[in-house]
Amino acid sequence: MPREKQKRGRRAEAKRKRDDVITDPTVLKRQKSSDVSNYPNRSYEQLEIRGDYIPLDEELVDSTGTAFYGLLDIEEQEYFSHASGLLELNQFETEEEKSIFIERVYEEANGKELKIACSQSCSRLMEKLISASTVSQIKRLFSKFIGHFLDLVQHRFASHCCECLFIHAAQYVTSEMKKKSSKEKENLEEDSTSELQLEDLFLKAISELEGNWGYLLTERFASHTIRVLLLVLAGKPLRNPSTTTVIASRKKEYLASKVGTQLDPSISEKQAVPTSFNKALEKMMKDLVTGLDNTYLRALATHPVGNPVLQVLLSVELSHMGKSKAKDADSVLRRLVPDENLQEDGESATFLKGLFYDPVGSRLLETIVQDAPGKFFKLFYKIIVRERIGSFSRNEIAGHVVVRILERLSKEDLKSAMDLILPEVPPLVERSRLTVIKALIERGIVRGVDLGPLAATLLSAYGDDAVSRINNMLKLQRSNKENDGTTSSSNTSSPEQLHGSLLAQAMLKSTGPLCELVQSSLLAVTPETLISIAQDPVVSHVLQDALTLPTSTPQFRRQITSRLSGKIAELALHSSGSHVVDALWPATRDLIFVKQRFAEELVVHERALRDSFVGRAVWRNWSMDLYKRKRGSWIAIAKGLEDSAEVNLNTLTNKPKSNIDLARARFAAKANGSKEPANTPSKKIPTTS
């Protein structure tokens, strides 16, 4: 079929016409003013208008709207990756050498801080540097981040650097505040050229984020930073187990321990914060929820990203701002639960009941139970929980909320709750859901509730046979299979085995039938099974507690230690068994002949113990060097006549002090303001006949 006749060069002519239209200056001006909204990216628009000219002082913006700070070249990546490896190995000879190395890395990173923070391969170096930095280095880095926090907190890698920076800077805010107050008392004028205080740097960072709280609340990475900021402003502990779970997930890797940095112990305690922090906290909390209606706020309760932020908001509101804040109509708690009387079929009661069974919302309910005012909790327990606590205990998710509820009950309420939970104990034992039972035992010990009915129920659930009882409780059949080589890894433990071990440890803390259930089972098993228990990393804690807790009677300790005779050296060379050997030292405090027999076993295997890391620890904890050289001193320690950690050999042997000891004593006495130390022997004046 003949083709249609077409003119040659039509495409080139059409392209030439388009180029003529674009290069027309009048068209360019109209396009710049009217069609600017068609460009989703401002930098792309400037690139089209200015041709190949890109201003060097302006940052590029990628298609997602976040700033792009550039990439490290290959040499820089290799250098910083090598520095990260050296910091993680932490094989510096002295702290001074480590400080010099960190300062050199900071010098090399000068001007590249934002690139490093946003780098997938080098952002971990930034976290390690922050963990090992001094306060001046943290201030310097904080100042480099100022002006970029809105983009950094939303970045996948830089957000972790921001969290690390805030956490480590928070521990210096209190010390700076104390120094500032002491200077004011002394009426000292501060240098006008001095660097900004961390207090001011924090406030600048918060001011950058203002106006964006609404979408940052549910942003995947920025929400973590918001939680940290709330806790820092409130002065709450940042390394407390109760707050760590809401700051980051369980998979969060804390790099401070890897670089050998010891965090200030005050970071795990409540901090004193400046007055400006309290004002900034109130404004931040108000801005976070002002634009949200009650329906959206309740939806956040089951939102996987927004829920942890809501937990921190509630915790800070109820614990930091006082219980009276809950009465405020604009408070987070009152907006979530507006019904003050909690009617059975009301909207608030329905909302709270739904949180019990939601895997995300139940965590918010735990926070409400922990921190809510007493009046609200009593009403909540009476209307919603009291008659349903048995059914709540059956559910795997609601059981965690029940544990928090049991922690706040009085003795009478705890007794009635236990009566309702007892019928659910056998099915809970069968499915290895033991957290509620463990909480009942622990709270019963604290409140002084009779735990006899619970012991009888556990006896019927686990069976009368002592051997099968301990096997079912600690899941020893699984451990035996691992020892036979049928399991790929013997170091991993199942949740059922862990929960059974924790339940047995709680039972050992109770005097009476609960403790006897575990002790009788440990005495009934064969010595081989007892050794396997001692060598298991999870269930060995049961044997350690059975030996050392006050509920352990001399008769029980005498029987259990005799079954370990001949196996002490084997246990001392095992990573888990060595802890059992350490527990045998206080367990045989009134059984000196047993302790001497164990010491003889250790002496026979001295070479093997000294060649092993855990063996050397056992040798040191048992003071075996003293046993070989000064048997009398060792026996005095073994009987508890002397401190086991530090032996005063001068007292034991009546050895007089040397001249250097006397000189040290005189120097210490002069430092304390006295002329002569009290224990300095008086000089004898020769008498003339």
Curated annotation (Swiss-Prot):
Biased segments, Basic residues type: 1-15
GO molecular function: RNA binding
Nucleus listed as a keyword: yes
Localization, UniProt: Nucleus, Nucleolus
Amino acid composition bias (Polar residues), ranges on this chain: 677-689
Function (record text): RNA-binding nucleolar protein required for pre-rRNA processing. Involved in production of 18S rRNA and assembly of small ribosomal subunit.
Protein name in UniProt: Nucleolar protein 9
Organism name: Paracoccidioides lutzii (strain ATCC MYA-826 / Pb01)
Gene coding for it: NOP9
